[in-house]
């Protein structure tokens, strides 16, 4: 399959009870993805609790993932921020060996205009030695990258090869798909609307639930890409309750509960994030038991 088509997963960061990085669990998580049909891995994205990691910890995570992956799957590294010059500098000094692309979130908090967003990605596209996937997640950034801006970026910044579209708006996603060149990838960043986006011409997903249910979720996406609509929706409706559960109290509290139930990680987060409530954990555990 073409690179960055199908199911990518935004890896969590497993922690031990003392909140240090659980490298063994991370290695096992990577291997679990490889063995169950995932097409690529995203390292140090939002789901990884990157905001709580030191630079040394980030380098350790990169090392562990690369060693566990052993060249099996393409790797995407999260590099982004709301200081354009800072992102440019990070791209210039970062060890990108072993990575195939960059995932870069649209600037958050300072709420740039569409022109500011365009110029931000223009600057980092010039600095990046790797292809860039833009990440639009207005629920976290407070600014939405509009379809027209995505199209402008797609046509003018050749190093930007796709967008992880996580506005949760299927109409906006379809407009993006209709505007951009055929070789520009519109990738779902919302697990619940991954299938309709894929059937509308999207290229798959960068998923959270996918790392917990890798075989079933990646099979759903492949079925959608192959036009097997009935088969894809059958899987979607089987998986859908888990998607509601894992985001009910924020990410990655829910997916960590699910992965802990499967025995892959310890259910530990760093403040300001906290574990899911006992009520939600019970729902997730019951889902896993009956899946």
From Swiss-Prot:
It catalyses: L-aspartate 4-semialdehyde + pyruvate = (2S,4S)-4-hydroxy-2,3,4,5-tetrahydrodipicolinate + H2O + H(+). Pyruvate binds at residues 47, 206. PANTHER family: 4-HYDROXY-2-OXOGLUTARATE ALDOLASE, MITOCHONDRIAL (PTHR12128:SF66), DIHYDRODIPICOLINATE SYNTHASE (PTHR12128). This is 4-hydroxy-tetrahydrodipicolinate synthase. Catalyzes the condensation of (S)-aspartate-beta-semialdehyde [(S)-ASA] and pyruvate to 4-hydroxy-tetrahydrodipicolinate (HTPA). Homotetramer; dimer of dimers. It is found in: Cytoplasm. The keyword Transmembrane helix does not apply. It comes from Christiangramia forsetii (strain DSM 17595 / CGMCC 1.15422 / KT0803).
């Amino acid at each position: 399959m073409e690179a960055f088509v199908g199911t990518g997963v935004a890896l969590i960061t497993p922690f031990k009870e003392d909140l240090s990085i659980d490298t063994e669990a991370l290695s096992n998580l990577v291997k679990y993805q490889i063995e169950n049909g995932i097409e690529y891995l995203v390292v140090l994205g939002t789901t990884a609790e990157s905001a709580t990691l030191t630079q040394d910890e980030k380098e350790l995570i990169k090392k562990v993932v690369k060693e566990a992956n052993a060249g099996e799957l393409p790797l995407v590294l999260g590099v982004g921020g709301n200081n354009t010059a800072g992102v440019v500098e990070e791209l210039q000094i970062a060890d990108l060996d072993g990575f195939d692309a960059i995932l870069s979130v649209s600037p958050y908090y300072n709420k740039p205009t569409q022109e500011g967003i365009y110029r931000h990605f223009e600057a980092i596209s010039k600095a990046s030695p790797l292809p860039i996937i833009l990440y639009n997640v207005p629920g976290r950034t407070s600014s939405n990258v509009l379809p027209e801006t995505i199209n402008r970026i797609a046509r003018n910044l050749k190093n930007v090869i796709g967008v992880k579209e996580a506005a949760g708006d299927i109409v906006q996603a379809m407009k993006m798909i209709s505007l951009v060149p055929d070789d520009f990838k519109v990738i779902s960043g919302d697990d619940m609307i991954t299938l309709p986006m894929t059937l509308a011409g999207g290229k798959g997903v960068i998923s959270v639930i996918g790392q917990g249910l890798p075989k079933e979720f990646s099979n759903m996406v492949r079925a959608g890409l192959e036009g097997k609509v009935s088969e894809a929706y059958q899987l979607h409706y089987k998986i859908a309750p888990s998607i509601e559960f894992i985001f009910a109290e924020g990410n990655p509290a829910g997916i960590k509960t699910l992965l802990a139930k499967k025995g892959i990680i310890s259910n530990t987060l760093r403040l300001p994030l906290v574990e899911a409530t006992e009520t939600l954990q019970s729902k997730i555990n019951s889902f896993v038991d009956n899946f």
